[in-house]
Each structure stands twice: as structure tokens, then as C-alpha cells.
Design a protein with these regions (language model features):
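PRPP-associated nucleotide enzymes
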Residues: 1-5, 9-176
């Protein structure tokens, strides 16, 4: 299957571990012509239009080579962040329904992702969702001491991690 974007046609298999893992999806390539949920295709187009998704030859943080690169830090407007949160909320709802309690965004780019996704999830599905994020450095003063920002997960909480890109899982390992 091919995914058409403004800057050319890219095989979905190329995007499988990048774009689709951004949404936290277990996506398998489908035969040519099979329907893709509209929001997934729209999300890829949105990333290209927002100049967030680049095509070329890139060395990722993990050391892997990739024919594309996604920089979530390039979402710079309120309307872009609103749409981004909606795409993430749709993907989470498709994969988990309402069977989660907390959205966790690892520092640093995951922080705004958790916030905009929590807002969008409430707007789209009516569920009040808590969010939390970690700090790379523990805070030792004020009311919010420690490594967490926002809600502090409790035993039994079901947590969904939202992140811009996952290639090796290193940031998941770095998060406690």
C-alpha cells in the first residue's frame, strides 16, 4: 500500500514503525486499495503540511537510518496543537477505548502531547483524563517536588504513554 503525501508517494511499510508508532498503533501494512481510517491518512498529510514530517536520509537518536524524520517540536501554533491532540485522542480511543486513567508524556516533547491529548479526549469523548509528565531533573523546592509534573499515578492506574516518536523504546526504558 502507498500513502500519498504532497511531497510524493511513500510505501506504508516505510512509515510503519515511524508514523504509525507515533500514534501508538500496532499497524500492519494492508493490500493496495484497502481503506485506512480517515484520521490516519489525514494525520500523515497534516504532518507534511505542518512541515513536521521530512523525507530524506536521517540518522535517528537511536543510531538507526531512516528515510523520514518527524519533529513534533515544529508544531508551533494553537490550531496545530489542537489538531494534533485530536489525532492522538482518536488513536488512543481506537486502541484502548476508555480503558485507561492517565496520559503520561515523557520530557520534553511528550509534555505538550499529553496536555493537548487530554484536552482533546475530553472534548471528543467526554471523559475527564488526568495527565502527568516527568522532569529530567528532580525539583527540590516548592509544592511540586520530585520528578513528576501534574497528576501522580496511583497503584492500579492504567497509564497510556504519548510520545512523538518511538524507534528503539529507549525513552520508555528511561521513564520509571
Amino acid at each position: 500500500m502507498q500513502v500519498r503525501v504532497d511531497k510524493g508517494t511513500v510505501p506504508l511499510s516505510t512509515l510503519r514503525w515511524g508514523i504509525c508508532s507515533i500514534l501508538g498503533l500496532n499497524v500492519q501494512t494492508t493490500p493496495e486499495g484497502s481503506p485506512m481510517e480517515a484520521y490516519k491518512s489525514e494525520f500523515i498529510k497534516f504532518m507534511v503540511e505542518s512541515d513536521v514530517l521530512k523525507f530524506g536520509s536521517f540518522t535517528l537518536k537511536s543510531g538507526r537510518q531512516s528515510p523520514f524524520f518527524m519533529n513534533a517540536g515544529a508544531y508551533v501554533t494553537g490550531s496545530q496543537l489542537k489538531r494534533l491532540g485530536e489525532y492522538y485522542a482518536q488513536a488512543i480511543h481506537d486502541n484502548f477505548g476508555d480503558d485507561f486513567d492517565v496520559l503520561f508524556g515523557p520530557a520534553y516533547k511528550g509534555i505538550p502531547l499529553a496536555v493537548v491529548t487530554a484536552i482533546a479526549y475530553h472534548e471528543l469523548y467526554g471523559k475527564e483524563v488526568k495527565y502527568c509528565c516527568d522532569r529530567k531533573e528532580a525539583k527540590d523546592h516548592g509544592a511540586d517536588k520530585g520528578n513528576l509534573l501534574g497528576y501522580e499515578p496511583q497503584d492500579g492506574d492504567r497509564v497510556v504513554m504519548v510520545e512523538d516518536v518511538t524507534t528503539s523504546g529507549k525513552s520508555i526504558d528511561e521513564t520509571y
